[in-house]
Amino acid sequence: MMSRYEELRKELPAQPKVWLITGVAGFIGSNLLETLLKLDQKVVGLDNFATGHQRNLDEVRSLVSEKQWSNFKFIQGDIRNLDDCNNACAGVDYVLHQAALGSVPRSINDPITSNATNIDGFLNMLIAARDAKVQSFTYAASSSTYGDHPGLPKVEDTIGKPLSPYAVTKYVNELYADVFSRCYGFSTIGLRYFNVFGRRQDPNGAYAAVIPKWTSSMIQGDDVYINGDGETSRDFCYIENTVQANLLAATAGLDARNQVYNIAVGGRTSLNQLFFALRDGLAENGVSYHREPVYRDFREGDVRHSLADISKAAKLLGYAPKYDVSAGVALAMPWYIMFLK
């Protein structure tokens, strides 16, 4: 029996829609772009290249046909500018709002810019999408919203206090989305991402995520630093699972809308386990790394453990993650080796 996602992938090429991806030059945005263009959809992309890269768009172009690429319209603009948002939303059926300044440490160092992008920018996008009468608005929420609540697995309706300015911004997004559905009858779905990883996730810069950062260090023969004792755990989610969730959410029925969903695999991996998984993944691709990890202080604003209950997304969206951590690492490694060597 076909999964809901497999059915959707069959349906979409027969009835192309217009999709807007904000943050299209970023990690998740460029993977959404690749999938939608390969499904013969029309895509508008908005990005200001604050954290996204032209090279991600160039890579997508190399992976699709010229005809598919001609279905893509890129707008260089900023979600903090309402005119840019209005321009991007014109004639769009589905919005996939990924643009944001990620990273807990970045938000601690510069809460004002995080607020301007993640809250003011989000509100601009809601207004523009509402006024353009789009069919649905799917946005990147975050597992950071669970804050200091100790319960595992994380269930959507039980959250704690935020532990960082970033977590505050992502929670405010959920509140605004909920209010827009109540006040304006506007359909939104929030996807609480848990530690997404995969191809095109940037290994460079001060705020690189753990998997690309460690992989880069290993390939270059540098030390790998673990904050804390290494028993901190996360629910790592390969990018293809996240793409699946976005497409299912955008096209979901009315009963599934105006809610938030955990998007993960529902499995916990400690940082120590992750270290060995990455080392093994590199070894399978002919890259050896013989150093042991270097442990240092636990990082401010980080939660100790994270594990998602994904039953709500499974039930209401038909979400069925296909890739666990080891499968995701196996798929991502050749890309990292090519990119970093």
Curated annotation (Swiss-Prot):
Cofactors that this protein relies on: NAD(+)
GO MF annotation list: isomerase activity; nucleotide binding
Membrane-spanning residues: none
Binding-site list for UDP-N-acetyl-alpha-D-galactosamine: S103, S142, S143, Y166, N195, V210, Y225, N227, R234, R299, D302
InterPro entries attached to this UniProt entry: Epimerase_deHydtase, NAD(P)-bd_dom_sf
Keyword ATP-binding among UniProt keywords: no
NAD keyword on record: yes
Impact after mutating Q201E: Does not affect conversion of acetylated substrates, but severely impairs the ability to catalyze conversion of non-acetylated substrates, rendering the mutant more specific for N-acetylated substrates than the wild-type
Signal peptide: none
Result for mutant: G102K: Shows a reduced activity towards UDP-GlcNAc while maintaining the same level of activity towards UDP-GalNAc. Loss of activity on UDP-Glc and UDP-Gal
Residue numbers annotated as active site: Y166 (proton acceptor)
Pathway recorded for this protein: Bacterial outer membrane biogenesis; LPS O-antigen biosynthesis
Biological process, per Gene Ontology: cell wall organization; lipopolysaccharide biosynthetic process
Effect of substituting S144K: Loss of activity
Enzyme class: isomerase
Effect after changing S143A: Shows normal activity on N-acetylated substrates, but shows no activity on UDP-Gal and UDP-Glc
EC number annotated for this UniProt entry: 5.1.3.45, 5.1.3.7
Catalytic reaction(s) noted: UDP-2-acetamido-2-deoxy-alpha-D-glucuronate = UDP-2-acetamido-2-deoxy-alpha-D-galacturonate; UDP-N-acetyl-alpha-D-glucosamine = UDP-N-acetyl-alpha-D-galactosamine
Mutagenesis or variant effect for A209H: Alters substrate specificity. Mutant is much less efficient in catalyzing the epimerization of N-acetylated hexose moieties and is more efficient in catalyzing the reaction for non-acetylated hexoses
Binding-site residues for NAD(+), renumbered to this chain: F27, I28, D47, A50, T51, G52, D78, I79, Q98, T117, Y166, K170, V196
pH influence on activity: Optimum pH is between 7 and 8.
Record function comment: Epimerase required for the biosynthesis of the B-band O antigen of serotype O6 lipopolysaccharide. Catalyzes the reversible epimerization of UDP-N-acetylglucosaminuronic acid (UDP-GlcNAcA) to UDP-N-acetylgalactosaminuronic acid (UDP-GalNAcA). Also catalyzes the reversible epimerization of UDP-N-acetylglucosamine (UDP-GlcNAc) to UDP-N-acetylgalactosamine (UDP-GalNAc). Has very low epimerase activity with UDP-glucose (UDP-Glc) and UDP-galactose (UDP-Gal).
Other comments on record: Whereas either WbpO or WbpP could initiate the two-step biosynthetic pathway of UDP-GalNAcA, the kinetic parameters of the two enzymes indicate that WbpO acts preferentially before WpbP.
Protein name stated in the entry: UDP-N-acetyl-alpha-D-glucosaminouronate 4-epimerase
Source organism: Pseudomonas aeruginosa
